[in-house]
C-alpha cells in the first residue's frame, strides 16, 4: 500500500505518521530506505495528538500487518472515522467509532464471490480470517451498531477488484442495516462507494 510513498517524498518533504511497528517495517523496504529519519513521526495507539487544529485519535485494529491502526479525526466538533484493513470488530471497535459525523469503512469482499473465485485457498482463508478484511455483510452489521441521527455520510472503501462489485457492496450494506435490530433503514443515510482510481466528491459534515 505504501510503495509510492518514496516517489511522493522526492517531490515534497512531508511528515509520515505511523505506528512504531509500521515505521520499522517501512525502513526495511528498499524503496523507502532513502527517507530521512526525521520525517517519521511515531503514533501510539490510544494516544491522541494534533496536526494544526485537527485532533487525531489512533486505535488498534485486527489485521495481519505491522501494527496497523485505524484513525478518528476531529475538527470544529466534527468527527470523521477511517476504518479499513480489519478482519473483525468487537465492542471496543464499535465504541470507538460511535458518534462519527462521517465514516470511511471497509467493505472488502462478497463472501460468495471470494469463495468461488480464483484466489488460492490460503489467501481466501487469510481474507476471511479475523486478521483479514471485512466482508460487505460485516460492514453493514458494524454500521448498524454505530448509526445515529447525526451521521452525515457513509463511504464504503477498500473494495476488492476481484471479489466485489460497487453495486453489490452498496445493496448488501443497505440490506444488513435494514435487517438489523435498529430503528434505522438502509436508505436513511447517504451511502456512497469510493472509486479505486478516481477522487471522491467533496463531502461536508
Region spans (language model):
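Active-site metal-binding loops of divalent metal-dependent hydrolases
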Residues: 21-22, 61-64, 84-88, 107-109, ...
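Short internal beta-strands
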Residues: 14-23
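Short, charged/polar "capping" segments at the starts of alpha-helices
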Residues: 22-28, 201-202
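Core dinuclear metal-dependent hydrolase active-site scaffold
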Residues: 3, 44-102, 202-205
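Short acidic-hydrophobic, aromatic-tinged amphipathic segments that line or gate anion-handling sites
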Residues: 40-45, 193-194
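Di-metal (Zn2+ and/or Mg2+/Mn2+) metal-binding site signature of metallo-dependent hydrolases
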Residues: 1-12
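Short, basic/aromatic-enriched C-terminal tail that caps enzymatic domains
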Residues: 189-205
Amino acid at each position: 500500500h505504501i510503495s509510492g510513498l518514496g516517489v511522493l517524498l522526492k517531490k515534497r518533504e512531508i511528515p509520515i505518521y505511523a505506528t512504531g511497528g509500521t515505521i520499522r517495517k517501512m525502513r526495511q523496504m528498499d524503496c523507502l530506505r532513502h527517507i530521512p529519519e526525521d520525517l517519521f513521526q511515531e503514533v501510539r495507539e490510544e494516544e491522541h495528538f494534533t496536526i494544526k487544529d485537527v485532533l487525531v485519535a489512533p486505535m488498534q485494529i485486527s489485521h495481519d500487518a505491522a501494527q496497523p491502526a485505524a484513525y478518528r479525526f476531529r475538527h470544529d466538533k466534527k468527527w470523521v472515522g477511517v476504518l479499513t484493513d480489519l478482519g473483525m470488530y468487537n465492542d471496543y471497535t464499535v465504541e470507538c467509532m460511535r458518534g462519527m459525523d462521517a465514516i470511511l469503512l471497509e467493505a472488502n469482499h462478497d463472501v460468495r464471490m471470494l469463495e468461488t473465485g480464483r484466489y488460492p485457498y490460503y489467501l481466501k482463508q487469510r481474507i476471511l480470517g479475523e486478521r483479514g478484511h471485512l466482508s460487505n455483510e460485516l460492514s453493514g452489521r458494524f454500521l448498524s451498531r454505530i448509526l445515529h441521527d447525526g451521521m452525515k455520510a457513509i463511504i464504503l472503501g477498500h473494495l476488492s477488484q476481484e471479489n466485489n462489485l460497487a453495486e453489490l457492496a452498496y445493496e448488501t450494506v443497505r440490506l444488513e442495516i435494514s435487517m438489523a435490530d435498529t430503528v434505522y433503514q438502509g436508505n436513511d443515510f447517504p451511502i456512497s462507494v469510493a472509486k479505486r482510481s478516481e477522487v471522491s466528491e467533496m463531502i461536508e459534515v
